[in-house]
Swiss-Prot record:
One of its GO terms (molecular function) is transferase activity, transferring alkyl or aryl (other than methyl) groups. The lineage of its organism: Eukaryota, Fungi, Dikarya, Ascomycota, Pezizomycotina. Keywords: Transferase. This is Aromatic prenyl transferase ptmE. It comes from Penicillium ochrochloron. Its EC number is 2.5.1.-.
Amino acid sequence: MGSLSSPTDLTPYQVLSKYKKFPSPDEEFWWDHAASTLADLIKWTKATPAQEYEFLQFFYEHVIPNFSGYRPYDVPGRAWNTGITPSGLPLEYSVNWRNIDANAMVRVGVEPISQFAGTARDPYSHYKIWDTLNQLSQVKALKSFDLELWRHFSSALCTSREEEALLDQTRTLPESFSIAKMQHSMGFDFCDDEVVVKIYLIPNMKARASGTPLAELLTGSIHAIYRDTIDRETLATVINYLDSTSNFNDATWFSFDCIPRSQSRIKLYGSDFRTTWSRAEDLWTVGGRYTDAVTMKGLAYLKELWDLLPIQDFETLPEQAVQNPPMLWAYEIRPGDKIPSPRIYIPGHCLNDKKVADGLSAFFKRVGWSDLGDQYTDRLFSMFPKQDLKDSTALHTWIAFSYTEKSGVYMNCYYLASASFPFKL
């Protein structure tokens, strides 16, 4: 009789894979090709085996079912186009590092897509996210889960069926909206003690349908629920800057956490076709409105990171925009904040992954994360062993940087969920 592997030789992912039952081949495919990468990222954060089991089980139960309506771009009859990743996948992974690499955290980004998304039954793909949130509300382990903000903002910033009918009838949506009909996506932070749920909304269609400018729509909806807990002057400074510089557009996102309102931050996201240092500097300082010591120290760190990465500066987005995605930005405001926390997302998609990894390794060492810097390139290769890092250009999608007085340097690296999916790397 041949020898059997000891259970202790198996990883949590391997143990779970032995006994999982899948309701469809599609769900089994997502587990086989995306959960393994997730397991590698969870290990990277120094999670315990118990946490790895917990997070992978959550992925199986509450993330994979969100992709029943996903079809690759080359599949005939595709009814819904997702827009949350440069690759076209409705799934994205990222790892957050702050202060020291021991404080790492995995985040999973998801666009819920039902099998009816884009059809007459669910033309703007609202059904699946409601179904997922209702399911999550029954999970006892999500102790802080709260839907108050979702109920408010989904009504205030997303279209109703009547508004969608009006948009379709008046044909006010440009052809480019074949992808951007999406109005919401989700994020799951795998924290030490529980999973925290985030919501991302795209309010451009609500603004079109209602005839309300985005600046006014966002300000009114935030004041209506937060009242004075989100500092009005701080919010107004950010809103006025974005409005005056034409940064409110079809790519504007709004985000919040599904936790009690008194604890939840808000975030405004956007994209900029000018991937240049001068533009990043302007966004970081909110057009020079904030030049305090903390803001400027963070800017100095950002410049170091910028110079270490193989960034291609563009004053305008090239015609091959899918291959050269724009720079992203975000402003985070927590209850009581007098200064917004900026974040710059440097596009990594279609930059050489070896050069990106080398630049990140050098930066990690500069900020004191020596172990992470020494191991980064090898760990990246171990997650994607079939990819030659010197030739690949799709493993890093975004490199996000922020800095606060409390947390210091805060990095968030976004990755391709799996190299097994059918699109060109």
